[in-house]
Amino acid sequence: MTKAAELAKMGEVLTNSQLGGRRNIVINGAMQVAQRGTSSGTGGVGASNGVYPTVDRFIFEAGNTAGRLTMTQETISDLSGFTKAIKLDCSTADTSIAADEFLMLGQRFEGQDLQQLKKGTSDAEKVTVSFYVKGNANATYTLELRDNDNSRSNSQEFSVTTSWNRVSMTFDGDTSGALDNDNALSLKCNIWLHGGSTYTGGTHTSNTWHGTTNQRVGDNQTSFFDSTDRTFF
């Protein structure tokens, strides 16, 4: 995945730089900075929760799964305008999915950096997330905005093919639940890669803010851990 960089208010120019005071919220969306190293190593990701394996700012949340993956920063030449991407590669499959299993890749945001979204007011702003993605085979995953202050979520499914595809999704503003104006975690932008029925068991309604745990993941979700052939860029 590259350029998960574009999380910004609807109507703003979605770039990696500021323009006329408009700014992108995601940091390191072009995947260029990897101060911790360019590879997660052979042990694999999935055993621990809250891990930053390689590229700066991108965190894995994982729990209760036997599946494992490796994460590397890759140099690419097949996507115009970009030289880096992350590659996720399934190293251990998990096809017996318990209810409470989960795996997400995402970025976290402090409430003080999100007050321009006006969440919890009648003037709540829409949010657009856009990025490029590809994989070894067709797949469907879920992108979620998770309000950590009020335990609310809004999610939409997106498709992956074997070629680079630009995904762009706009999320409605949420008039319920203001974000705290401080330096604590308030919002997560998560890509769901794997989830059990605790998160998938309900009927998913796209682009709707809610507080129901089993509706966080889309009905057509692919498990990244379904095969050791599975990759995600």
Predicted region positions:
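Extracellular and organelle-lumenal recognition/adhesion modules and their flexible linkers in secreted
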Residues: K3-F233
